[in-house]
Swiss-Prot record:
GO terms for biological process: dimethylallyl diphosphate biosynthetic process; isopentenyl diphosphate biosynthetic process, methylerythritol 4-phosphate pathway; terpenoid biosynthetic process. Isopentenyl diphosphate binds at residues 43, 81, 131, 228, 230, 273. This is 4-hydroxy-3-methylbut-2-enyl diphosphate reductase. Transmembrane segments: none annotated.
């Protein structure tokens, strides 16, 4: 089968840095034990399992503050998605050692929020309800940051915003087209709003790659965890912008061969938190796949994964 390897794809620098920090923590005998990650270090179940194999456990809950209460001692790693000041403060109260793996792009958004709120602004934040990145961003100034995900949320914003200085900003991993559309709706309601688009460069170029390269494919396969917002947005971009059907899979085991019926060329991309070896297995399988040759339909030889985490230096 013809396979188009959509590029760029896969790991971004924030994800790589977060995983390296977590590995270095696991290998550092000077850090207090046990070591926990507060939420998934990046949104990929394979990565979570690999850290569990190294003795680093992931704890999760309805929100980060509640999840933190399950950690009694030792070291806590904060994930790439960022964390609220309340969680930092509670970790200090519990006398936990902290390793902060927050992506620098997320930190920049937090710094922006702090700066404008100090100057008496209200912040409208475009993001996904229930995702840890908006949770952390809203937590920077909960009384002044207003999370919106759809047009209806704009209509429900507090009336007093009309008389306030306002900025609109966003979660770094959203669809850039969705963010632009919502920001336009915000601008219509609040013509005086200041726009600060914080889509990270890695998200933007991966979405643009799908928009530009998927059009001549019959199907696009996005390799990424179901909890990975940026992976889900890549599938959405294929549908909405390139007009090419797309399926997101966590790994090769989730590939339904019936999707390949009548497909001549398939495009493959992957989310920013998807380990490269997992995507490579999908590409390798598809490249040898022949609908007419049943011997090429067996996924088993392509399922073995060895090292999936980036190499690190021991500190």
């Amino acid at each position: 089968m013809l396979v188009k390897k959509i590029s760029p794809r896969g790991y971004c620098y924030g994800v790589v840095d977060a995983m390296k920090l977590a590995q270095q923590a696991a290998l550092n005998d000077n850090l207090p034990r046990p070591i926990h990650i507060l939420g998934m270090i990046v949104h990929n179940a394979h990565v979570t399992r690999e850290f569990e194999r190294m003795g680093v456990l992931t704890v999760d809950g309805p929100d980060r503050l509640e999840a933190l209460e399950t950690i009694k001692e030792g070291t806590v790693i904060f994930t790439a998605h960022g964390i609220s000041p309340a969680v930092y403060a509670r970790a200090a109260e519990k006398k936990l050692t902290v390793v902060d793996a927050t992506c620098p792009d997320v930190t920049r958004t937090h710094d922006l929020i702090r700066s404008v709120v100090a100057d008496d602004y209200e912040v409208i934040y475009v993001g996904k309800h229930g995702h840890p990145e908006p949770e952390g961003a809203v937590g920077v100034a909960p009384e002044h940051v207003h999370l919106i995900e759809k047009v209806e949320d704009i209509e429900a914003l507090p009336a007093h915003l009309a008389d306030k200085k306002i900025i609109v900003t966003n979660q770094t991993t959203m669809s850039q087209w969705d963010v632009q559309a919502l920001m336009e709706h915000v601008r219509k309601k609040y013509p005086h709003v200041e726009v600060h688009n914080e889509i990270c460069n890695a998200t933007q170029v991966r979405q643009e790659a799908v928009a530009e390269q998927a059009g001549d494919c019959d199907l696009v396969i996005v390799v990424g965890d179901p909890r990975s917002n940026n992976s889900n947005r890549l599938a959405q971009v294929s549908f909405d912008i390139a007009a090419t059907p797309a399926h997101r899979i966590g790994d090769l085991t989730e590939l339904d061969l019936s999707w390949l019926d009548g497909v001549n060329q398939v495009g493959v991309t992957s989310g920013a938190s998807t380990p490269t070896p997992i995507t490579k297995k999908v590409i390798d399988f598809l490249q040898q796949y022949d609908p007419a040759d049943i011997s090429t339909h067996d996924k088993t030889p392509f399922l073995e994964l060895r090292r999936i985490l980036p190499k690190v230096k021991i500190l």
